[in-house]
């Protein structure tokens, strides 16, 4: 089972979709976040997690001090796991789930009448 590695939600177990995703190992996520935090790229960031799967990368950013998180995945199974994870920890209350293709989400946020490109970190896994 996956878990949050560090921060306010450290140790929180995460549900993962049973098929169609291969969650990143804890060691790999720890290395990625070590590099991001060394650059000050997580704390107070607004984060976009495309192809979110379980939401582990995005939830890790919230646990480590990100201000907000948009999770995007078109899979209903992934959305079910993410909703379960959202309910599991109050530290995740700043997250929003969008069940739609990533390109459609980007087009609706960065193209058109009301573009909203204010994201410091975009995670694509």
Regions found by a protein language model. Give the residues of each.
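Class I S-adenosyl-L-methionine-dependent methyltransferase catalytic core
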Residues: 1-124
